[in-house]
């Protein structure tokens, strides 16, 4: 659903280890980021083995971390992933459609000469299959539109990603298609469906409540549980970094649009929030790297995302101390302590950016999360909405997540959707911790955005009351980003955002746009903008999908 904070304050022995031989740098370009990710995919074998590689400089960092987190060593020893939850694969006869990636990979287009003959669709797809079934709207009552659910299967690696597709309520033959991704990492996109922007929500009586401001009012939407072992998705193994998840997304979309070509000709967009600020630049880059594809990617949208940690972490102190438009929630001494910690935090993040090494990126995550987020978190306030306290710590401050979990764990719901796991959880904190301990948290995926801007429009929007991925940091990184349109973007003026229906002239936000880059600040909204500002969110999304702020 969002940046999950239960593991923000963990200690890590890997915070102080020497770089492995052959560590790849995450600098510029998608290929270098893929190489760097490969170097961090193997988890630590034992705590003691990792400690043996500690350098004197790393030892100093580790000693500092132990002062900050006294039980860090014990927490590090218990990091290693637990067994996946039980699952039972349904027979092929339970599905209406099965698409084999090997069949798509075998499709060729004959040219006038042998040199001009080429595969119809790029990418290694032979290990992937897609299963789909029609969902009877009358059984669940979430919406009356055509729906499909199913799994993308990576047969070679025992990975199975669950998705739920809703057709547009308006004109599905022509309306765009949107892929929605929640963050975490490790939180189910079905919470986005049933809590934020989907056609229905779950109330305290575990009943469906119609959402008149659903994003599928004017777009067909795919809600995807990813990476594996999130929501209804499952695997015998795990995914611990964003790049590894990117190939699964490309395969899912390729096979889905092959099975359902009636949606393939429409414009396609990727949208998400929170840790999707990591996912989306990588996933979009993966798609665009394949020149022969059946995915008509037109834009990406990131809401209250974690995209550039170096800039984002600079703005935690201002947001908590009264400079983000809301009153201070920390004392002067606490604010000063955050100021004092910032230079070290930024130095560690920069080291992660420069090296791309897990041994640099993990300590940056641990130190900065403790020093820059910890003081706020210890107040008991909602990290996703600075305006109030955390109402339900067992459900990431929102009781509605508990309602959703109860609904999605009902046998009749799981059967209607074809879910193959034994139970549903809104967030898998093993995944969250796994991504953190493999160095993914601080990776500079924002460096992929300039190349995206050369090809497609990018929207960054942020609710102004969020703390964890606050608007100050999101505005800051968009203005710091090095790209060819930087000067014009930074000189662009803000304009008010008002509802297109014009029945209310009071602005619900403000927007600045130049070239392919657009930033929106949404008023009176926390981390989940569609939840706090339902009508405004569907307003700006519909206008964005229609191309209102796209470069001419």
Swiss-Prot record:
Record-linked Pfam families: Carbpep_Y_N, Peptidase_S10
Disulfides per UniProt: 187-427, 321-335, 345-368, 352-361, 390-397
Propeptide residue span(s): 19-133
Primary localization class, coarse: other
Positions of transmembrane segments: none
Cellular component, GO annotation: fungal-type vacuole
Active site: 274, 466, 527
GO biological process: proteolysis
Positions glycosylated per UniProt: 218, 516
The family this protein is said to belong to: Belongs to the peptidase S10 family.
Name under which the protein is recorded: Carboxypeptidase Y homolog A
Source organism per UniProt: Pyricularia oryzae (strain 70-15 / ATCC MYA-4617 / FGSC 8958)
Gene name per UniProt: CPYA
